Design a protein with these regions (language model features):
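Proline-aspartate-enriched helix->loop->beta-strand connector
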Residues: 67-72
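His/Asp/Glu-rich mid-to-C-terminal helical/loop segments that flank catalytic regions of hydrolases
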Residues: 199-231
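Short, acidic/turn-prone active-site loops that include or flank metal/cofactor-
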Residues: 29, 50, 93-96, 194-196
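Alpha-helix C-terminal capping segments
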Residues: 61-65, 81-84, 178-187
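Mid-sequence, gly/pro-rich, charge-dense loop/helix-turn segments that line enzyme active sites
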Residues: 80-164
Length: 231
């Protein structure tokens, strides 16, 4: 099988990239793909860039060019609710927090003609959960919401929390990746490490913890690939 792995920033994928054997680099437009073997599994690692449009275009290219059996979205996220920095978030579903077509009878966050939420593949998510549980960091399993904003405003944070009370984390790509996978019939999973608390500490806190959070999520993804290779 071949697995696609998507991260938005170099610091989120760097430890994965340097672990790929026989790595072949391909550039398509502004996107960079790294193809090879990681812990016995064929992978295509993709640097998507930040934000929903870039993530969607990148995911489409990944699927069309490489036809992966599974797509993993990894990296970092802003924590919501009872999460803390360096906790792990594993999504059971992802939604857009910056979409509103409720005037036409849709739920808040639901794109027109799309489901209210994009559900992570249950089988692969359970396998990833079993791997993540081996680590000492707190694991949260639940809803993740996406939008094209870095949430540093407490007011905006409260709006998101009120609208999506089940959300465990907020970030800027997962819903777009998941929607693209839904449209093209490719299973997806999402695992990220919390780099900051949304609405608290803003960019300074983020820059302090993002590197280690990115390494943590990458470590779990590598262990997940190894577990697949062993079966």
């Amino acid at each position: 099988m071949k697995i696609g792995i998507i991260g938005a920033m170099e610091l989120e994928i760097d430890s994965l990239r340097t672990s790929i054997e026989s790595c072949k680099e391909t550039k398509i437009g502004r996107f960079v793909f790294y193809e090879g073997t990681l812990n016995g599994i064929e992978v295509v690692l993709l640097l998507s860039g930040i934000g929903k449009v870039s993530a969607s275009v990148a995911t489409t290219l990944l699927i069309e060019r490489y036809n992966p059996s599974l797509i993993i979205n990894t990296g970092t996220a802003g924590g919501l609710g009872d999460t803390s920095v360096h906790d792990i978030i594993l999504a059971n579903e992802v939604r857009h927090h910056d979409v509103d077509v409720t005037a036409f009878g849709y739920e808040i966050g639901q794109q027109a003609q799309m489901p209210p939420a994009f559900i992570a593949n249950t089988q692969w998510t359970e396998k990833l959960k079993q791997v993540a549980e081996r680590y000492s960091h707190t694991l949260h399993y639940g809803q993740v919401v996406s939008g094209d904003s870095f949430i540093s405003s407490p007011t905006r944070l409260q709006e998101i929390a009120n609208t999506f009370p089940k959300a465990k984390a907020v970030e800027m790509e997962a819903a777009a990746i998941a929607q693209t996978c839904y449209l093209l019939n490719i299973p997806f999973v999402m695992l990220r490490a919390i780099s900051d608390k949304a609405g608290e500490g803003n960019a300074v806190s983020y820059e302090t913890f993002v590197v280690e959070a990115g390494k943590l999520s990458a470590t779990i993804i590598k262990a997940f690939l190894a577990s697949i290779s062993e079966t």
